A protein has these predicted regions:
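An extracytoplasmic/periplasmic, membrane-proximal ligand-sensing/linker region
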Residues: 31-33, 264-325
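Ligand-binding pocket segment of bilobal, Venus flytrap-like solute-binding proteins
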Residues: 72, 154, 158-162, 166-238
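Short coil/turn segments
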Residues: 43, 98-99, 133-138, 159-164, ...
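N-terminal (or domain-start) structured segment
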Residues: 23-116, 179-203, 294-296, 317-325
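Residue-level signal for nonpolar/aromatic packing positions in well-ordered secondary structure
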Residues: 34, 43, 50, 68, ...
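Hinge/capping helix and adjacent helix->loop/strand transition within the periplasmic-binding protein
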Residues: 85-91, 105-192, 241, 253-286
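C-terminal lobe and pocket-closing loops
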Residues: 125, 211-279, 308-311, 324
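N-terminal secretory signal peptides and thylakoid transit peptides that target proteins
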Residues: 1-14
Length: 325
């Protein structure tokens, strides 16, 4: 390349870098606050995650304001449809949780396509597990498997709903353990399920580790195993399913998304802000206090995980469509 061409190319690159820096520093349009739609009730895991991380994101972008609104219903479908059909102008963002995000349009008609959203940042990865009462006869996964085989179709388990990460985890577990289907009792979240478990109305709960970790530490519940690759540092005494000889990896991945077609300039700015927020020491400290197992992924990495989830569920749906149970 000639010296003149090198000079022009270098000048163009410098101008592009300057424009990017100015865009990152420019105030966010402040005609109204950014609405962050949480498709689940207040106080749940997705809601808590959103309210914890979003103030740190807005702090990175001058002029940006936000308000979190809860639009729950139909296991997240109502809120996800609102996010999907919002104008891609940066004034509407939302939260979601995989794999329920992918499962909804597979099992029923929905006004959104799971992979068409703009994926901004995943925040939490909370593994599924089996919670039992402290007086349960099941001391480990092997005990539960033996009981399921000895009493086919009699054991009862609770989840946070049909098509939830908990329910899909159970389908994978039954397949891996080669046990007859157990009796599924869906609830509208972990909050109403846990008292029923404590009261002896279900044999065990298939939920996330973080859902009842405080009760485990109080000695009111036990965890048989966690469906993670490694033991979570907040539950180091709980073996993984792989340690029990079962290849079961499942959990809830909670993150932030935008409507389809969010402009690249907006997406890049938000992704950069999330990258900083997810390293913030105050955020890390509070997440630990609230038993939030972090799994930070930004932009394309988050979308790639969502695509893997989509592919896995398509296979599961063909093998065992869960809307029937």
């Amino acid at each position: 390349m000639s010296g003149r061409r090198q000079f022009l190319a270098g000048g163009a690159a410098a101008c592009a870098a300057t424009r990017l820096a100015r865009a990152q520093a420019a105030p966010w349009p402040s005609e109204r606050p950014v609405e962050v739609i949480v498709p689940f009730p207040a106080g749940g895991g997705v809601d808590v995650m959103s309210r914890l991380v979003m103030p740190l994101v807005t702090a990175q972008i001058p002029g940006m304001r936000h308000v979190v609104t809860n639009r729950s219903g139909a296991a997240g479908q109502i809120g996800l449809e609102a996010i999907f059909n919002a104008a891609p102008d940066g004034y509407t963002l939302g939260a979601t949780t995989l794999p329920a995000h992918n499962a909804i349009p597979m099992e029923r008609a929905a006004r959104f396509r799971a992979m068409d959203f703009t994926f901004l940042a995943n925040v939490v990865g909370d593994a599924n597990c089996f919670y039992v009462r402290t007086d349960s006869p099941f001391r480990n996964v092997a005990d539960l498997v033996a009981a399921a085989r000895a009493r086919p179709g009699q054991l009862t388990y609770g989840t946070t709903g049909v098509g939830s990460d908990d329910h899909l985890f159970m389908l994978n577990f039954e397949q891996a353990a080669q046990v007859p289907p157990m009796v599924h009792i869906p609830f509208a979240g972990a909050a109403p399920l846990i008292p029923q478990l404590l009261g002896g109305h279900v044999d065990f709960a298939a939920i996330n580790v973080g859902d009842a970790l405080a009760m485990k530490r109080e000695g009111r519940l036990r965890i048989l195993a966690q469906a993670a690759e490694t033991r979570w540092e907040e539950a180091p005494d709980v073996p993984t399913f792989r340690e029990a000889g079962l290849d079961v990896l499942n959990g809830a991945e909670r993150g932030l998304i935008g409507p389809p077609g969010l402009p690249e300039a907006i997406t890049a700015r938000l992704s950069a802000a999330f990258a900083v927020a997810l390293r913030d020491t105050d955020f890390l400290r509070e997440a630990k206090r609230q038993f939030m197992p972090l799994h930070p992924l930004v932009g394309s990495d988050y979308r790639a995980m969502a695509q893997r989830t989509e592919d896995q569920l398509q296979v599961l749906w063909q093998r065992r469509p869960w809307r029937e149970r």
